[in-house]
């Protein structure tokens, strides 16, 4: 179904990451053997996507690829229909041969908020936990990261990533593995680890922070983004059921409380670098994501609250270091 041989070869040649080969191949074999109702339809469409490197690729200011000679209308429409097979597209946007994949999230806005605050990614190895379809990994490569590894257990996100990678000429600097972080050994191998939009889905947030720390080299940097509430270092919201229609959500600390949590598990130099209310311009339904989105999840009479009565989504970005 999927061939991870190139990634295994990369691990075999990397003395720091090589021990991952003790567990990873069997995990990915088990994943491939598990059935998923839509996977055959998606793979059939993926095989039809043309392979080959575009003449022009921009990963620095966007994720855009084009040829010097544009696709003819029929070819472009065929490609657009194939990409629509992978609906819903949640993270992006992408522009592919004049096809604008207008995703649910303006993930580029988040990237613009965090980029000025992080250690430059040039020549760094990066792990992106809960990477979605890999949009931010392409932006990391635009900042000249040496290697980007993303993990996310979603079949659809892997298909979307492989579709974009195929159009990119099968770029081997980025790899998406269909795993959760709990399946990773303590690699202590990455210069930078990103965890964005994951923490509130974890039953034990402190354990998640420890898992992230265990993926970093000594002195490595964590970039953590999550939903927060207003309040002091003791403020935490734990929704009884749903939050903005999301199930499986647990802890929403204040940014100040999250800073304390990071310090309590051994991170140093912890900084709150951004807090931002999520707007309906940043998250909304589109032709590429036709399901309900943030506008339907807010109280129609009070946009400062979710339909359950909780504070409306607000996200914070924190930067922290693993001690040397």
Swiss-Prot record:
EC number of the protein: 2.5.1.-
Binding positions for carboxy-S-adenosyl-L-methionine per the UniProt entry: 91, 105, 110, 130, 152-154, 181-182, 196, 200, 315
One GO term of the biological process aspect: tRNA wobble uridine modification
Keyword Amino-acid biosynthesis: no
Broad enzyme group: transferase
A Pfam family recorded for this sequence: Methyltransf_9
Keyword Cell membrane applies: no
Highest taxon, organism lineage: Bacteria
Catalysed reactions, semicolon-separated: carboxy-S-adenosyl-L-methionine + 5-hydroxyuridine(34) in tRNA = 5-carboxymethoxyuridine(34) in tRNA + S-adenosyl-L-homocysteine + H(+)
GO molecular function: transferase activity, transferring alkyl or aryl (other than methyl) groups
InterPro entries documented for this protein: CmoB, Mo5U34_MeTrfas-like, SAM-dependent_MTases_sf
Annotated keywords: Transferase, tRNA processing
Oligomer status and interactors: Homotetramer.
Function: Catalyzes carboxymethyl transfer from carboxy-S-adenosyl-L-methionine (Cx-SAM) to 5-hydroxyuridine (ho5U) to form 5-carboxymethoxyuridine (cmo5U) at position 34 in tRNAs.
Sequence similarity: Belongs to the class I-like SAM-binding methyltransferase superfamily. CmoB family.
Protein's name according to its UniProt entry: tRNA U34 carboxymethyltransferase
Top-level taxonomy: Bacteria, Pseudomonadati, Pseudomonadota, Gammaproteobacteria, Vibrionales
Primary gene name: cmoB
């Amino acid at each position: 179904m999927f061939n991870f041989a190139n990634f295994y070869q990369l691990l075999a040649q990397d003395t720091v990451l090589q021990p991952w080969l003790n567990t990873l191949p069997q995990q990915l074999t088990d994943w491939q053997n598990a059935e998923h109702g839509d996977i055959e339809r998606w793979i059939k469409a993926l095989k039809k996507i043309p392979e080959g490197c575009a003449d022009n690729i921009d990963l620095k200011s966007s994720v855009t690829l084009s040829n010097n000679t544009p696709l003819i209308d029929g070819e472009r429409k065929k490609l657009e229909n194939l990409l629509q097979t992978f609906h819903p597209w949640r993270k992006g946007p992408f522009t592919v041969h004049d096809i604008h994949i207008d995703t649910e999230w303006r993930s580029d806005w988040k990237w613009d908020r965090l980029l000025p605050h992080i250690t430059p990614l040039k020549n760094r190895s990066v792990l992106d936990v809960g990477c979605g379809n890999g949009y931010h990994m392409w932006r990391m490569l635009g900042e000249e990261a040496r290697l980007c590894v993303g993990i996310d257990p979603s079949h659809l996100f892997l298909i979307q990533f492989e579709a974009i990678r195929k159009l990119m000429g099968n770029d081997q600097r980025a790899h998406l593995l269909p795993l959760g972080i709990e399946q990773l050994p303590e690699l202590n191998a990455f210069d930078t680890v990103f965890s964005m939009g994951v923490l509130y889905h974890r039953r034990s947030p402190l354990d998640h922070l420890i898992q992230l720390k265990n993926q970093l080299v000594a002195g490595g940097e964590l970039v953590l983004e999550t939903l927060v509430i207003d309040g002091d270092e003791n403020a935490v919201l734990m929704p009884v059921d749903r939050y903005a229609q999301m199930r499986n959500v647990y802890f929403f600390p204040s940014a100040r409380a999250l800073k304390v949590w990071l310090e309590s598990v051994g991170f140093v130099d912890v900084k709150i670098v951004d807090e931002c209310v999520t707007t309906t311009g940043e998250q909304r339904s589109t032709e590429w994501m036709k399901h309900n989105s943030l506008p339907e999840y807010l109280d129609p009479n009070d946009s400062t609250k979710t339909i359950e009565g909780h504070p409306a989504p607000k996200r914070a970005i924190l930067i922290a270091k693993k001690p040397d």
